[in-house]
Amino acid sequence: MKRMNILLVMLLWVASQMQAQLVQENETAIVYYMPKTELVITLSYDCVEQIPGVFYQYAQRYLGAKNIVTEKKTTYRLNDMTLCTKASADTDRAYKVNAQKGYNTQLLSLTTDGRLAGYNIGYEVKGDKVKGEKQEAKAEKQEELMPLLEEQFMAGSVAKMAEGAAKQIYRIRETRLNILGGDVEHVPADGKAMQLVLDELDQQEQALVALFVGTTMVTHHKHTFSYLPADDVEKEVVCRLSKYTGIVDKNDLSGEPIYLTLKAHKQSLQTAYMVDPKATIPSQLYYNLPGTADISLQHQALSISQSITVAQYGVSIPLALDLFKSKQEYSIYMHPETGNILSIKQ
């Protein structure tokens, strides 16, 4: 037990010394960083815009309609929430490899932001895709002319125009029934031609009915933002959804809260000792033994839960110096997202 405690202290001291070191003037060294994990939260929501028809006051009288839009309004509703992760360099966990101490620094492979990707692997540097903070689908609306005939426009009053539009709707429905029943003078030549005629009649009817019951247009939107996991949190408000303005700031009480709960499972130096109890002579190359976290998001009745790997919850463990002093060449593959070892090959 005493030996184990001494080794744990040594590991902690070595890690702290490596992080404290800076590249001195005229010193040949490469600095690399452990990764840190960010949550990328995407909220999918709809904007529902309702516009009343010009004849909405006559919808019940002429069409017997009940679900009628009587006023113009816009509302928002949340459909889905998703979680994923992205990695970046953790500048608080920096290490260096000194060329004067027998390391071939040219064999080090780093990502564009300085995370360690491997040693002697010929890593191809690829830039991470940058995601926008907010992405929204846009819908363009065009003014449409009312689908009325000349005689309806000349009716002289809104009530007469509504009556004429209703009669036109019933004529369209009657024509459709006659075509389907074969009770027309000129029957469409084939099934495809008949379907084209029926589709045209449907469009005419929908346009006329909308003058009475109104229209509802739904546009789909996405809001994406990042969250950096730290300590445990219980129902932290990360943002809000307002029924009338959409996604708003977490301090805007006009919206209903979207909660995030996080339970961290951090690694310890005791775990590091269990990984390598022989405590071989450490090198200047460290890998990360990451931790995990249980994440949940909740908004009213909608909720999701997920377990993720979190790099900053891990501990740094030195690779054995023997790997670099051996006559055999080793290739060490690292996971740039977590800092952990993927594989070691001769």
Q: What is each of the regions a protein language model found here?
A:
Residues 21-346:
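N-terminal amphipathic/basic membrane-interacting segments and domains
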